[in-house]
Swiss-Prot record:
GO terms for cellular component: helical viral capsid; host cell cytoplasm; ribonucleoprotein complex; viral nucleocapsid. Homomultimerizes to form the nucleocapsid. Binds to viral genomic RNA. In nucleocapsid, binds protein P and thereby positions the polymerase on the template. Protein P acts as a chaperone on free protein N to prevent it from aggregation before encapsidating genomic RNA. Displays a superantigen activity in human and mouse, activating mostly V-beta-8 subtypes of T-cell receptor. It comes from Khujand virus (KHUV). It comes from the Viruses. This is Nucleoprotein. Encapsidates the genome in a ratio of one protein N per nine ribonucleotides, protecting it from nucleases. If expressed without protein P it binds non-specifically RNA and therefore can bind it's own mRNA. Interaction with protein P abolishes any non-specific RNA binding, and prevents phosphorylation. The soluble N-P complex encapsidates specifically the genomic RNA, with protein N protecting the genome like a pearl necklace. The encapsidated genomic RNA is termed the nucleocapsid (NC) and serves as template for viral transcription and replication. It holds the Pfam family Rhabdo_ncap.
Length: 451
């Protein structure tokens, strides 16, 4: 019989079926540029820059912006921000610019234009007869791109977080080298009238292009990045979290993965480290692949690597990190099991400190110290890891090898110890939990645990 089939009875009738599930037709897509052409978009006819400025500024003042006109203006304004390429700049086999070339944000991409005229209406509330200065253009560009960052702020953020962010960004574009062009709080008012700027593909593309340019090129107006920085590694929260995790525990990626004791990590680790990607290439198109339209469904998002994401943030919660406590649990990716593993790893890598001597009076003292430490290491590696630290308060967990940590988990029946639960409850109960956050999960799951 087919090994994939199961047999059972329905009303005394023998039934044999092959269980199958719906195949996800919307597969994860790795960023790639197969034709060696720069990322491109198509916009309407290029406007007169000064006329466009006056139209967009009047729309911003009246909180009535035409997205197509905004995108057309942002693309046209790129010519105002020129800089010198510090080195040969290549990505995915494409030569973006050579060392010493004068470049603008438009150099990074291909912006095609049609003959379709923009609207360029004057909404009102503006009486500007003179042509704007470069500083005023820069302020308008900065304010428009700030709408992208505001639209990315989660609705779960409590209090006045979004208003405070808007105020800080406006303050940047009111002071030199920028110029004040609108009344304070205009940005937040405009955002409320259209809160979904990050979902407009062309606007997202231009925000990513500006960010990619200013992240590499030193420029008088680099502060424009305050609104676009969220396009860097967008939809890469799984990969970004893993990168931060290995820095915290001071291990290489290879060493860290040895502690991932769960079968569901296999597919995610394979997905996250697909060969041929420019994940470690500085200033690559990869960094902005979502905004530049190089991937429809990111394989590096928290949903794509949910078990890895959950584990990392449970470890972060164990250490009381606000970012982890506020993060949203991926509920379909074994959060209970990940919280157990997170407790053990949190204790092993953070709970006991990682202190060691690094500086010495002379080379002789250094060698003596290294010799003494090697003896301690040999002793630690011989430890079978069977000591229960709940029973022996002074057990220091000398070895943190994957084998020793795994043994400790198995010796406790794959369950958290009392000390882990106390720690989880302590950090989560003292935190204002957001809906579906790690703090809420830990509080609900372990606050009533009888252990």
């Amino acid at each position: 019989m087919d090994a994939d089939r199961i047999v059972f009875k329905v009303k005394n009738q023998l039934v044999s079926v092959k269980p199958e599930v719906i195949v996800d037709q919307y597969e994860y897509k790795y960023p790639a540029i197969v034709d060696r052409q720069k990322p491109s978009i198509t916009l309407g006819k290029a406007p007169d820059l000064n006329k466009a400025y006056k139209s967009i500024l009047s729309g911003l003042t009246a909180a009535k912006l035409d997205p197509d006109d905004v995108c057309s203006y942002l693309a046209a304004a790129m010519e105002l921000f020129d800089g010198t390429c510090p080195d040969d700049w290549t990505s995915y086999g494409i030569l973006i610019a050579k060392k010493g070339d004068k470049i603008t944000p438009a150099t990074l991409v291909n912006i095609q234009r049609t003959d379709v005229e923009g609207n360029w209406a004057l909404t009102g509330g503006l009486d500007l007869t003179r042509d704007p200065t470069v500083a005023e253009h820069a302020s308008l560009v900065g304010l428009l791109l700030s709408l992208y960052r505001l639209s990315k702020v989660s609705g779960q953020n409590t209090g006045n977080y979004k208003t405070n962010v808007a105020d800080r960004m406006e303050q940047i574009f009111e002071t030199a080298p920028f110029a004040k062009i609108v009344e304070h709080h205009t940005l937040m008012t405009t955002h409320k009238m259209c809160a979904n700027w990050s979902t407009i593909p062309n606007f997202r593309f231009l925000a990513g292009t500006y960010d990619m340019f200013f992240s590499r090129i030193e420029h008088l107006y680099s502060a424009i990045r305050v609104g676009t920085v969220v396009t860097a590694y967008e939809d890469c929260s799984g990969l970004v979290s893993f990168t931060g995790f290995i820095k915290q525990i001071n291990l290489t990626a290879k060493e860290a993965i040895l502690y991932f004791f769960h079968k569901n990590f296999e597919e995610e680790i394979k997905r996250m480290f697909e060969p041929g990607q420019e994940t470690a290439v500085p200033h690559s198109y990869f960094i902005h692949f979502r905004s530049l339209g190089l991937s429809g469904k990111s394989p590096y998002s928290s949903n794509a690597v949910g078990h890895v994401f959950n584990l990392i943030h449970f470890v972060g919660c164990y250490m009381g990190q606000i970012r982890s406590l506020n993060a949203t649990v991926i509920s379909s990716c074994a959060p209970h099991e990940m919280s157990v593993l997170g407790g053990y790893l949190g204790e092993e890598f953070f709970g006991k400190g990682t202190f060691e001597r690094r500086f010495f009076r002379d080379e002789k003292e250094l060698k003596e110290y290294e010799a003494a430490e090697s003896v301690k290491t040999d002793t630690a590696l011989a430890d079978d890891g069977t000591v229960n630290s709940d029973d022996e308060d002074f057990f220091s967990g000398e070895t943190r090898s994957p084998e020793a940590v795994y043994t400790r988990i198995m010796m406790n029946g794959g369950r958290l110890k009392k000390s882990h639960i106390r720690r989880y409850v302590s950090v989560s109960s003292n935190h204002q939990a957001r809906p579906n956050s790690f703090a809420e999960f830990l509080n609900k799951t372990y606050s009533s645990d009888p252990r």
